[in-house]
Amino acid sequence: IVKRGVTELITPGVSLNDGVLNSKTNNFLAAVYFGAHTGVSFLDVSTGEFLTAQGSTAYVSKLLQNFRPSEVLIEKQKRQQFSTAFGDNFNTFYLEDWVFQQGYTNESLCQHFKTKSLKGFGVDGLPNGLIASGAILHYLGETQHHKLKHITSIERLLESDFVWMDKFTIRNLELYHSNNSNAVTLIQVIDKTLSPMGGRLLKRWLALPLKSVAAIKARHDVVQYFYLNETALMEIQSSLKGVGDLERLISKVATAKVSPREVVQLKNSIEQILPLSLIHISEPTRLVSI
């Protein structure tokens, strides 16, 4: 006798299916909470990235335009407010208002991370952002996504760290999309990355230009190093060609959705990490985020 029951609900924001996901694009599930400050949170369940922020409606609008979530969770009674503030171009799902109670969401987050508070993550000053984050965890439970050990931290997005572009700027610059079907976007021109992780990181960097001169210079220094050391560049590129999508493979292991073929891919990818780690040990400046 086979026990029947709902084992998983697939929605746009929680898919782990490679046939649905774009390897070089994050698949974010977002939640928005309206309060004195608008809270917002983004989770890519396929990679484990968990981000939160709060601020003005204009700031949250820019975040939504830059992260382009596949699905947005909001309170049932705030449908019209969301539509007025952010438009109707998002896939939305409405949750009961009690899900967005601060006590409930904080408890959900602390239980998930197995901590007594969230101070260690540097997000305790974002109460409305954390309400949105807790609502995301609730939704994952509702859709039968209970194995989430790969989500190990939550990070804050600081408005002061980046240049934030509105939807009109993003559209006019044709960063990743164009209304002209024959047009070539900026990301298509500059993306020469060899790994899916690198492709997603490049897209993130393009969406969130840095303000800090020191941080910009640090990136330039890495580029200069590889420009002047072609042998090192080719050595790393050779290793990267054998690396699969480690972030998503590890997430599939954590969620018990990995296939035998993907286990082999993970093994082969890990074997390529050793040469990279040796490069890192011998010359730290030669290894960048990939």
Residue ranges and their predicted role:
Residues I1-Y225, M234, S238-K241, D245-A254, ...:
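Charged catalytic and DNA/RNA-contacting regions of genome-maintenance
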